[in-house]
Design a protein with these regions (language model features):
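Disordered, low-complexity "stalk" and linker segments at domain junctions of extracellular
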Residues: 1-197
């Protein structure tokens, strides 16, 4: 810099990119395929970026729908797309499954995968107590075994050309693109829902 301080060479984009493809899922059929004993499941996934001690989660991918047995359904996952690496620090991938509640559909965590150099690590034999099958991750969990609810359903990356950033006292950041004023999710500067514009 002008004062003799070194200029940073490494930098990261603000925000986490939305995955470009739906997850690749294969259903393992069992003997009970009667319609009354099957269910349709929707799966999607997000990227997780680490910034210091803070984890930032992307908006979800498109969903994939599969039909499987309620009692013993097994869905195998593989071929997760390679995450972008240049100027992003994506360290994880979270897989979610839709759960139908009394009045709404929520996506709940199935598992979290480690991402190294953009690729999901599936070389381990087990992950979080689940044994891989020929490099494929099996979901055999019952609904009550699922984890946290997806919170980033409506998150978006900061819009292209965002300028004039101002910290607000409520934890939000405001900025503008042309004549549009944008706001981030409170205390989450990587998430800029277009509904807040």
């Amino acid at each position: 810099g002008r004062d003799g301080a070194p200029i940073p060479r490494n930098w990261l984009y603000m925000g986490v990119p939305r995955p470009s493809k739906a997850p690749h899922a294969t259903v393992v059929r069992d003997s009970d395929t009667r319609p009354e004993n099957t269910e349709v499941r929707a799966y999607l996934y997000t990227y997780v970026s680490t910034f210091g001690t803070v984890s930032e989660e992307s908006a979800p991918s498109d969903a994939v729908n599969v039909t499987c047995s309620i009692s013993g359904g097994k869905v195998l996952f593989d071929q997760f797309p390679i995450a972008p690496t240049e100027h992003y620090n994506i360290t994880g991938l979270r897989l979610y499954r839709a759960v139908i509640g009394a009045s709404e559909i929520s996506y709940m965590l199935v598992d979290e995968f480690t991402v190294v150099k953009g690729e999901v690590v599936t070389s381990k034999r087990t992950m979080n107590g689940v044994r891989f099958e020929d490099g494929k991750y099996p979901d055999t969990r019952k609904t009550e075994q699922l984890g946290i609810v997806l919170e980033s359903l409506y998150y978006e990356e900061p819009p292209e050309g965002l300028r004039g950033l101002v910290n607000m006292p409520n934890g939000m950041i405001a900025g503008f693109v042309g004549n549009q004023v944008w706001f981030c999710e409170p205390y989450l500067p990587h998430a800029w829902p277009s509904t807040y514009m």
